[in-house]
Regions:
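A beta-strand edge to alpha-helix "cap/lid" segment located at domain peripheries
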Residues: 4-5, 20-146
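Bacterial N-terminal signal peptides
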Residues: 6-15
Length: 146
């Protein structure tokens, strides 16, 4: 009976412990996403690189895969610049040392001299290693609006 009461008490307490930790980590991820957006607008390849794992890739809306070196090279060259990058409907999920983020992102800028405005569903997957979150993969899907 005593063991049963302990289990019941733990069951009542555990839900209050988990979300607090998860929401703290979720806030860390939200801040990283905001800082990443600022670095993109500033065209700061060095700062952007600090958010990305060495083996990071992005899957573009056409299904192409771009690795970290190529992506940062495009940023450094100035071929891709952003004037704005705004994310809404951000959903963050934490799983131990992994986090997923989905958001609706609207961006304006220039690519190879051509102006663009995009609206995409973006997904980022972060892994926490040695106390630091790094994005390991990003994926973009055109948003048609629904």
């Amino acid at each position: 009976m005593k063991a049963f009461l302990i289990i019941i008490m733990l069951a009542m307490v555990m839900p209050t412990l988990g979300p607090k930790r998860g929401s703290q980590m979720g806030e860390e991820i939200r801040k990283l996403e905001e800082e990443f957006g600022k670095a993109m607008i500033q065209n700061d390849a060095e700062a952007i690189g600090r958010f990305l794992a060495d083996d990071w890739i992005i899957i573009d809306p056409d299904g192409g895969i771009i690795d970290r070196a190529r992506f940062l090279g495009v940023i450094k060259s100035g071929a891709l610049t952003h004037q704005a990058m705004d994310s809404t409907d951000m959903r963050i999920r934490i799983y131990a040392n992994t986090a997923t983020v989905t958001a609706l992102t609207t961006s304006t800028g220039k690519y190879m001299g051509q102006e663009f405005k995009t609206q995409e569903r973006a997904t980022d997957v972060f892994v926490k290693e040695n106390g630091q979150w790094r994005c390991v993969i990003s994926q973009l899907t055109r948003f048609a609006g629904k």
